């Protein structure tokens, strides 16, 4: 059985976590949870200064990391990106939206807006898994919904405002992209994500980098009288975020780990540093896949390959499931493919916390496993 294969210790990565979310958390960040002063935060009120100072640090850190233009704000709340699809449906789409769909997760927001009884029919532009479509300027569209990185397939797309769409908002699902891929904030109105990917924390929180136009849209929709449940009310989240707090109680460890990761990124050179680490890892993974006889990158167009989520197809003669099982038995975990894609492949998380040298060790470990199958 593949699980009986023993990979030599000298081949293994120093850290065997390659998941696409939850992802590797740096040991230094975990240590910060028990550092002097942490006990004044954990187990205390999120309405008081110790916790509010953490939220403030996160908001200021993300403003710096993404070089946000004047007027842009960092807004946060509970529920993760899944909640934000509903929040945006209720509070940012005025009537009609256009969605680019090229995988499981980019389809979720499209489904939410399509099912909303108070919105007009959305336009959905699809492409095959392993590719991404392009936005098209369209009359009557007030939100263009893009996805920076499709986590299920390992496809990334450049974020740029579609030409001829003045007055419409550009909303970007950056769940697995934020912090690991470069982006220009002037090209979006809302860039939303969760902290369990590049930001090496736990899930359950959403964060949104919002332009003045997006905030104004939220205020306009709220004033229109549209019924919005309080938990999904973006105006309430904005109001609380400006006070460095969330509407309801957040997971404090999640906030603290997020804060540690943002500080680490900024201290080492900001987004250029963080995205550079992921790019280095991706270069090693795809370079190995292209030169290895039994593997090929799933995304055939190099320009569309993700630097944070790598999907690698295996020759039909090799069962990628068996490879993943052998890796897991050796402490190298979460390399399994996205379940609904149905491909004979591995999916590798290459977020900034992952040491690029560990990607080399991972590929050496895969080669060893395949040689023993």
Question: Over which residues does each language-model region extend?
Answer:
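N-terminal "arm"/small-domain region of PLP-dependent enzymes with the aminotransferase-like
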Residues: 1-45
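Conserved PLP-binding catalytic core of the aspartate aminotransferase-like
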Residues: 296-326
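Active-site phosphate-binding strand-loop segment of PLP-dependent enzymes
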Residues: 125-179, 190
């Amino acid at each position: 059985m593949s699980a009986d294969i023993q990979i030599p210790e000298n081949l293994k990565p120093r850290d065997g976590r390659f998941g696409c979310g939850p992802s590797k958390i740096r040991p230094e960040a975990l240590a910060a949870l028990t550092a002097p002063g942490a006990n004044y935060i954990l187990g205390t009120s999120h309405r008081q200064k110790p916790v509010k100072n953490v939220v403030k640090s996160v908001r200021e850190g993300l403003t710096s990391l993404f070089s946000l233009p004047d007027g842009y704000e960092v807004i946060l709340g509970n529920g993760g990106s899944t909640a934000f699809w509903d929040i945006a449906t209720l509070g940012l789409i005025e009537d009609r939206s256009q969605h680019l769909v090229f995988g499981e997760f980019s389809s979720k927001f499209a489904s939410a807006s399509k099912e909303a009884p108070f919105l007009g029919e959305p336009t959905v532009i699809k492409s095959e898994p392993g590719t991404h479509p392009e936005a098209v300027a369209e009359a009557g569209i007030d939100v263009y919904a893009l996805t920076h990185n499709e986590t299920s397939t390992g496809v990334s797309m450049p974020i740029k405002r579609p030409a001829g769409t003045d007055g419409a908002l550009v909303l970007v699902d950056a769940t697995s992209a934020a912090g690991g891929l470069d982006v220009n904030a002037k090209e979006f109105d809302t860039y939303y994500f969760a902290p369990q990917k590049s930001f090496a924390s736990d899930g359950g929180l959403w964060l949104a980098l919002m332009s003045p136009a997006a905030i104004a849209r939220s205020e306009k929709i709220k004033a229109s009288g549209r019924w919005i449940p309080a938990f999904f009310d973006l105006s309430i989240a904005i109001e609380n975020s400006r006070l460095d707090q969330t509407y309801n109680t957040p997971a404090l460890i999640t906030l603290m780990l997020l804060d540690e990761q943002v500080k680490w990124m900024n201290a080492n050179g900001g987004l250029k540093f963080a995205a550079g680490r992921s790019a280095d890892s991706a270069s090693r993974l795809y370079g190995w896949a292209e030169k290895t006889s039994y593997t090929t990158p799933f995304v055939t167009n190099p320009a569309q390959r993700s630097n944070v989520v790598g999907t690698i197809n295996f020759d039909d003669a090799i069962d990628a499931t068996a490879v993943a099982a052998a890796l897991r038995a050796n402490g190298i975990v979460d390399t399994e493919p996205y379940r609904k894609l149905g491909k004979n492949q591995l999916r590798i998380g290459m977020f900034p916390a992952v040491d690029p040298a560990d990607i080399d060790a991972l590929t050496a470990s895969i080669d060893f496993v395949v040689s023993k199958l």
